[in-house]
């Protein structure tokens, strides 16, 4: 059963302005080490890479129904890739706690994430699916 759906649209140019204005302070506060390493390897699409991940964090916060309140912080939501290359979320801290609280007894949650960009927009969708154990 679906227990949460979230989507977000992020302006890549807005992320570029944050990178220009706040630099390392912005990326360290918002993104995980894995996310930063991936974005920094992509010199030509650095801002778009960050924007997609920013949108994924926002989409997850909507899927769990809290936004960035109730102990859910951006850095607790990390985008990583499965061996197949498909994106997924790695959750820690308040983000993991909130998802655990939403998970019905006797179920596990699969997090489905898709991201895309077409300048100047980056978009992400998150579906939280509870499956019986």
From Swiss-Prot:
It is an enzyme of class 2 (transferase). It comes from Rhizorhabdus wittichii (strain DSM 6014 / CCUG 31198 / JCM 15750 / NBRC 105917 / EY 4224 / RW1) (Sphingomonas wittichii). Belongs to the P-Pant transferase superfamily. AcpS family. HAMAP family: AcpS. Its cofactor is Mg(2+). This is Holo-[acyl-carrier-protein] synthase. It comes from the Bacteria. Disulfide bonds: none annotated. Mg(2+) binds at residues 8, 58. Its EC number is 2.7.8.7. It catalyses: apo-[ACP] + CoA = holo-[ACP] + adenosine 3',5'-bisphosphate + H(+). It holds the Pfam family ACPS. One of its GO terms (molecular function) is magnesium ion binding. One of its GO terms (cellular component) is cytoplasm. It is found in: Cytoplasm. InterPro entries: 4-PPantetheinyl_Trfase_dom, 4-PPantetheinyl_Trfase_dom_sf, ACPS, Ppantetheine-prot_Trfase_dom. Keywords: Cytoplasm, Fatty acid biosynthesis, Fatty acid metabolism, Lipid biosynthesis, Lipid metabolism, Magnesium, Metal-binding, Transferase. Transfers the 4'-phosphopantetheine moiety from coenzyme A to a Ser of acyl-carrier-protein. GO terms for biological process: fatty acid biosynthetic process.
